[in-house]
């Protein structure tokens, strides 16, 4: 079975800012924050660290940054879905702006993820692209404008609400996240209060003066938003 994600949740990754032991240390900080604030944290791990993070961070939902759609056999240098799953990944990122894919490839990758009970976490550059991908029914959709990723400038609330409405109109079961350009814990809180089921940050955390402290603060804001939304119901 695929992992059951509790909303709202937090998502982060290391991209290529750090590597080796530093990745594990960051993942362990995310794992501690997940436990401390009782929030689900999705962690996009480099391939080389998936198994180590799985063995040391039992509370994280681990995503591979990409996978191919081939099956066991020939295909040297391709990323085999079964191998990613065996290493400990719970899901896979699909169509990130730094690894863009055709709609056909997105469809095939979602199908392979479903076959292996892996979560499909899709990215989209525009609301129109998000609508097209929503037709393929991924588990999670992150409509983040490419120009904002790593820029330090987040999407405005009008875009956030419009993106959520557009995706939910096609498939209300898709979880919608906002993550591009987030640099503060307050932005995490604001996006979730605006209706996003998740928010995340990678560059904003890792380029901050104290990444571990900011990571914990961001996860705490997910918890705060969750508690406040519960009181409104």
Spell out what each predicted region is.
Residues 70-71, 77, 138-165, 174, ...:
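Glycine/Thr-rich beta-alpha phosphate-binding loop at enzyme active sites
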Residues 58-113:
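Glycine/small-residue-rich loop that forms an oxyanion/phosphate-binding "nest" at active or ligand-binding sites
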Residues 1-79, 120, 128-137, 216:
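Conserved N-terminal beta1-alpha1 strand-loop-helix module at the mouth
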Residues 65-69, 73-76, 104, 122-127, ...:
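Glycine-rich beta-to-alpha transition loops that act as phosphate-gripper elements at the mouths
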Residues 15, 46, 84, 144, ...:
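Conserved, mostly hydrophobic/aromatic
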Residues 109-115, 155-158, 204-233:
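C-terminal helical cap(s) of enzyme catalytic domains, especially alpha/beta-barrels
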Residues 79, 124-137, 181-199:
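Catalytic cores of alpha/beta
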Residues 90-101, 141-153, 194-215:
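Glycine-rich phosphate-binding active-site loops on the catalytic face of alpha/beta enzymes
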